[in-house]
From Swiss-Prot:
Pfam families: AAA_18 (PF13238). This is Putative adenylate kinase. Residues 108-118 are annotated as: LID. It catalyses: AMP + ATP = 2 ADP; ATP + H2O = ADP + phosphate + H(+). It comes from Methanosarcina acetivorans (strain ATCC 35395 / DSM 2834 / JCM 12185 / C2A). ATP binds at G10, G12, K13, T14, S15, R109. InterPro entries: Adenyl_kinase_AK6 (IPR020618), P-loop_NTPase (IPR027417). Its EC number is 2.7.4.3. Gene3D superfamilies: P-loop containing nucleotide triphosphate hydrolases.
Length: 186
């Protein structure tokens, strides 16, 4: 089963996915790292200190990588971790964070003020959640505000375990659309 773990930068995707990789031995594809390592991008955006992913190249590379991972008998879950994961997977978990907290997290990382504000604004208008609805069949949402990576990883586990066991009715608390932060960023 391929599941996307997406969200605005700073919501906890990488921390959570690394915990799940250790605890559950689920295979994780850190898509942003793959894009950089294998040069699956069209250009370097100096202003934003990032690369512009070539989604055609990304989509053509992933099936081979996922097939290799799924060959391992114990491996039932592959998680695609990235703020771009919702463009690729049919099932996605969107990690969210209250924009003022998100700003603090990104400032700690040393992001420029412009990049911090751009990401906080994207979070306040539900940008990634809205895109996930457009691209994915199943969308779940987890609020990471004031929570540890371990607590959030527990929620991700609950969602994935429920999907694997066919018990989606247990997942109403992760239904998207309950968070409204439009007024949180000036």
């Amino acid at each position: 089963m391929l599941i996307g773990l997406t969200g605005t930068p700073g919501t906890g995707k990488t921390s959570v996915s690394k915990l799940l990789e250790k605890k559950r031995q689920w295979k994780i594809i850190h898509l942003n790292e793959l894009i950089k390592e294998e040069h699956l991008y069209t250009e370097v955006d100096e202003k934003r200190d990032s690369v512009v992913a070539d989604m055609e190249l990304v989509r053509s590379r992933l099936p081979e990588l996922i097939n290799e991972m799924e060959k391992e008998p114990a491996n039932k879950v592959v998680i695609l971790e990235s703020h771009l994961a919702h463009y690729i997977t049919d099932i996605v978990i969107v990690l969210r964070a209250y924009p003022p907290e998100l700003k603090k997290r990104l400032e700690k990382r040393g992001y420029s003020e412009e990049k911090v504000n751009e990401n906080a604004e994207a979070e306040s208008i539900d940008l990634i959640l809205a895109e996930a609805f457009e691209w994915c069949d199943k969308v779940f949402e987890i609020n990471t505000t004031g929570r540890t990576a371990e607590e959030t990883a527990g929620d991700v586990e609950k969602i994935i375990d429920s999907l694997l066991s066919g018990k989606e009715e247990q997942l109403q608390e992760y239904g998207p659309g309950s968070l409204d932060w439009i007024d949180s960023v000036p």
